[in-house]
Amino acid sequence: EENRHKLLGYLYGAWDYVKNSGKFPEAANLVLDWVGSVPGRRESRRFMGDYILNENDLTKFTHFDDAIAYGGGWSLDEHCPGGILNDKEPASYFHQRFEKMFEIPYRCLYSKNIDNLMFAGRNVSVTHIALSATRLIAICGLMGQAAGTAAAMCMEYKVSPRGIYKKYIEELQE
């Protein structure tokens, strides 16, 4: 609850600045009519899978034989990687749009060192920059569907998630 209040304070403080600083006359007639009741965090723990998806994979449109999800409707974007209160390093910000769809490999959805641990969503095996394009709800949903299907296949075939990659990836991709 304390963090929620802090985050809402930052949001309302930024809105107050935009509306009342005089530096944004185009905002004079704008209103803030809705704010989510639970502010979300962009970053979370990310686990290490057999493959760590990175920025180059996304920008060079690397093809993966074990692709289970696709993205590209949103750009790569980074801002304030150290957090909004970090005054030790300058804030960075960039957007890079995609020319076509990128692929997310199944190997990002299971642990490289813990049997039967799978993940989907913001905790998948990606770098900080790759997360900026893979964190979106639709892509997380695709990864969740793939992880759930793979988990069912693990039970059916009596194999680990890695076993699905080695023997049954084409069936998972159907």
Q: Predicted regions: what is each one?
A:
Residues 1-174:
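Flavin (FAD/FMN)-binding glycine-rich loop and adjacent Rossmann-like elements that form
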